[in-house]
């Protein structure tokens, strides 16, 4: 879930702290990526619908390969542009998240029931909508993703708990430059720079949103603890939300009272009932001091791709097109060995002007010199991967 309504609130209250960028703007940057969120996006993007049946990207053996296709293609696209992706995987969820996870399971069950009803009624639109709400990333898919990345020579970090918190730790300790995730709570965990839409496909044509925490705090006048309290009131994964407290009231409440304790004392009990389990002190402490592996103990190293291992895994086991895989390996080698010029900010101190965010999008219609798979739309025939959309009965 992340933080409900935080993105819109920041666009309204601190737009100068947000930039709109393109992939090429991160040349030479190490980016810590929320792996589970990214893989979930790939599975959703490649899940289609046709003639009343769900469709998924599979190989000739019928195995779902959406996660591997998306991860392979998008990672290659990033390294082509000079990025250095670091994928961080979730560990054990914190106890505070138990209620949220239970609610997610219930919502998935309800979505499945609605899907079944829509199927009986022949409502294709509702079936497609509900089918995406039932998607879950399996343990097997996560392990396959780790294996693929390691064979590609891309760093993999296993977080002890929340991936966003571990990503923030890497950025705070200068092991990476930014966190890439769709969950806004990366900022709540203290990530100095956060990117949204980094792993979106080119077909979506959405610019990357770059959030700067120091500027957000400076423009809004909030301390980090007040920002955390604001996020808790907006709605997070660790405590239930107070009914009747929306973004505007949460903002005004923290600006006026300074913290949740004082705000709660001012609430009209008849209008706002604080739910049982609103342990905001524990949530606040978890945001301030989450369970992470200290960045100093993590080695980040980009390695030569394992050609033999990739061919065995992707071509022999997962039935990928061999030519596509070999070309991908060469692209990885080119990125690893390329003699690149340093970024200017490695030699000079760059002062970022506080201005209106750059809204320049990438030019549409420009053909790329390499192949990439679209992560949206319906694939009717085999693509360069050798895989195709099949009806899931």
Curated annotation (Swiss-Prot):
Phosphorylated. Phosphorylation upon DNA damage induces relocalization to the nuclear plasma. Binds 2 magnesium ions per subunit. They probably participate in the reaction catalyzed by the enzyme. May bind an additional third magnesium ion after substrate binding. PROSITE patterns: XPG_1, XPG_2. Residues 126-257 are annotated as: I-domain. DNA binds at residues 74, 162, 235, 237. Mg(2+) 1 binds at residues 34, 90, 162, 164. Belongs to the XPG/RAD2 endonuclease family. FEN1 subfamily. This is Flap endonuclease 1. It comes from Trypanosoma cruzi (strain CL Brener). The lineage of its organism: Eukaryota, Discoba, Euglenozoa, Kinetoplastea, Metakinetoplastina.
């Amino acid at each position: 879930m992340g933080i409900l309504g935080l993105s819109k609130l920041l666009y309204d209250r601190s737009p100068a702290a947000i930039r709109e960028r393109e992939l090429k703007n991160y040349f030479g940057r190490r980016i810590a990526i929320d792996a589970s969120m990214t893989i979930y996006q790939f599975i959703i993007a490649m899940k289609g619908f046709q003639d009343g049946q769900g469709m998924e990207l599979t190989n000739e053996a019928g195995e779902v390969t959406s996660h591997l296709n998306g991860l392979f293609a998008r990672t290659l696209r990033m390294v082509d542009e000079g990025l250095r992706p670091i994928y961080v995987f979730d560990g054990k969820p914190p106890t505070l998240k138990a209620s949220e996870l239970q609610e997610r399971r219930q919502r998935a069950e309800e979505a499945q029931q609605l899907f079944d009803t829509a199927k009986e009624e022949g409502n294709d639109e509702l079936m497609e909508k509900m089918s995406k709400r039932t998607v879950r990333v399996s343990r097997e898919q996560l392990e396959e993703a780790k294996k693929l990345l390691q064979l590609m020579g891309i760093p993999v970090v296993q977080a002890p708990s929340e991936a966003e918190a571990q990503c923030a730790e890497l950025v705070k300790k200068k092991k990476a430059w930014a966190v890439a995730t769709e969950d806004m709570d990366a900022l709540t965990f203290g990530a100095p720079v956060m990117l949204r839409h980094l792993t979106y496909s080119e077909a979506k044509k959405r610019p990357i949103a770059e959030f700067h925490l120091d500027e957000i705090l400076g423009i809004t006048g909030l301390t980090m603890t007040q920002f955390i309290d604001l996020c808790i009131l907006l709605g997070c994964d660790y405590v239930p939300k107070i009914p009747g407290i929306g973004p505007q009231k949460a903002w005004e409440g923290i600006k006026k009272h300074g913290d949740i304790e004082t705000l709660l004392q001012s609430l009209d009990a008849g209008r706002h009932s604080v739910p049982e389990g609103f342990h905001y002190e524990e949530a606040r402490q978890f945001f301030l001091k989450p369970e992470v592996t200290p960045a100093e103990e993590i080695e980040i190293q980009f390695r030569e791709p394992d050609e033999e291992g990739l061919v065995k895994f992707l071509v022999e086991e997962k039935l990928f097109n061999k030519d596509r895989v070999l070309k991908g390996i060469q692209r990885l080698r080119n990125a690893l060995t390329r003699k690149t010029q340093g970024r200017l900010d490695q030699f000079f101190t760059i002062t970022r002007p506080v201005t209106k965010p750059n809204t320049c999008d990438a030019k549409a219609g420009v053909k790329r010199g390499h192949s990439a798979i679209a992560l949206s739309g319906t694939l009717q025939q085999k693509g360069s991967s050798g895989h195709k959309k099949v009806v899931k009965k």
